Regions:
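N-terminal beta-strand motif that seeds the catalytic metal site of vicinal oxygen chelate
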Residues: 1-35, 78-80, 128-132
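Short acidic/glycine-enriched loop/turn segments that link adjacent beta-strands
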Residues: 51-53, 74-76, 109-112
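Short polar/acidic secondary-structure junctions
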Residues: 70-72, 106-107
Length: 132
């Protein structure tokens, strides 16, 4: 349902609706290594850095956060899917930085061009762009 907030009753308050994702926070046990990985992909640091316990990267209106947690790496839990302006250019950038994407960019039957990459802590990130 993509409807705007709807009234709870004719005279009552409106029901709240979820509007967007502000941030995704991923755990790392090695902040310097994780920061290098995300910087190599072009994520600009908004707060923190390699020697901090918390780092935030800004992209669009959202953030990708890293937090030091001794329990990392994690078991596979799913993936974060981020839209980018050019999937193939980002794939080439990853290769040039010595990173190892899971596969070459491909066109999916659901209408996106995409590839996956796994960060040093086992978090799977997908970079995608809708096909037009």
């Amino acid at each position: 349902m993509n409807s705007p907030a709807t009234p709870a009753s004719a005279n009552g308050p409106t029901e709240p609706r979820i509007e967007s994702i502000s941030a995704i926070t991923l755990a790392t046990h090695d902040m310097p290594r994780a920061v290098l990985f995300y910087e190599a992909l072009g994520f600009p640091i908004k707060f923190g850095g390699p020697q901090e316990a918390f780092t935030s990267f800004a992209f669009g209106d959202s953030y990708l956060n890293l937090i030091v947690d001794a329990r990392a790496p994690v078991a596979w839990w799913g993936r974060v899917i981020l839209y980018v302006s050019d999937v193939d250019a980002l794939y080439r950038k990853a290769l040039a930085a010595g990173l190892k994407p899971s596969f070459e960019p491909s066109d999916a039957p659901w209408g996106e061009r995409y590839f996956h990459i796994t960060d040093p802590d086992g978090h799977e990130i997908s970079f995608a762009k809708p096909l037009r």
